Amino acid sequence: DAVLDLVMSKEDTSLRCACETLVTTNRVVLAGEYKGILHNQEVDSAVRKVIKDIGYEQDGFHWNNVEITNLLHGQSADIALGTDTFGAGDQGLMFGYATKETDNYMPSAIYWSHRIVEELTKVRKQGSTVLGPDAKSQVTFEYNDNSKPVRIAKVVCSTQHNKDADIEFVREFVERIIREVLPAHYVDSATEFHINPTGRFVVGGPDGDCGLTGRKIIVDTYGGSSPHGGGAFSGKDPTKVDRSAAYLTRWIAKNIVASGRADWATVQISYAIGMKDPMSFYIESNGDSRQLTKTVENLVDMTPKGIIDRFELFRPIYSSTTNYGHFGKDYLPWEKIDLF
């Protein structure tokens, strides 16, 4: 997405980008297609800045000496035939979801999982030498018969740590942070905390585990609370409906719930490459789903250009989606409550 933002910084709707990234020990590989001007030096600088900002300065992956292989090349003329007139960049189906479980209309489990790792990052960047930049979490909620979250049953958190840190100290340190994040009324004496279950976690990030664009699409979205069409978001310009239509469906779902028309809503849409209008559209909710579907179809321009124009998507805003999910951040345009 940092490479995409380089392209989007020109704010030219004729530009295109589909950038894939592979990261492993001391190596970053970029591949994909773009339309526009990308200088190798600015791409190199953008990649190193991302790595530095995350905090990777370890022997096996350091922003200053990582080897960058840039295999980006021009967009296919065949694909351009469809997208230059703002037809969909590919076929596919996309889903959006919202629930009134949390203040930002996200499911409880993914919401609190994001808050945990967000706080770990904050503690680390405020000067803690215990934690490393690689971390992830998972929260298991129990629901009552009315589908309301009532307690947290289990919390899993794995975080990279200093090689000299005692594992029990790390576990206690991290558990204290987690308990400060989670609402007390969800946590009880039976709540289980599984922190670094395998024990030592010193070698982390791309040095310990190869990473590839699109390998974590559920943590990018709703944590499994909603179906997923399978298309990843990052690196894709907004003519790719994998991304832009997923943002549209989130906006629709959020506005339905925020307006009180339902307690939860799942929105599905699909497209064919080169075609402007959706192939299908439906809403499932605990409200009047049939009427909601008709109402939204009449109110919303669901063509790729309509989506792009509504959210002003030809802007360099995509790096801000790369951690803590693509949804639930009020400053992003598809999170606005302004449909009804």
Locate each region found by the language model.
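Glycine-rich, mobile lid/loop segments that gate access to catalytic sites or pores
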Residues: 17, 25-27, 45, 49-202, ...
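Secondary-structure transition/capping motifs at alpha-helix termini
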Residues: 9-11, 257-263
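Short amphipathic alpha-helical face segments that pack within enzyme cores
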Residues: 2, 111, 115, 244-251
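Short, charge-patterned binding micro-sites
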Residues: 16-37, 273-277
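Glycine-rich anion/phosphate-binding loop at the beta-strand->alpha-helix junction
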Residues: 164-257
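Short glycine-rich or small-residue beta-strand-to-loop segments that form or flank ligand, phosphate
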Residues: 27-35, 94, 98, 156-160, ...
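Internal helix-turn-beta structural module
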Residues: 262-264, 268-340
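N-terminal, positively charged regions that mediate nucleic acid binding
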Residues: 1-16, 23
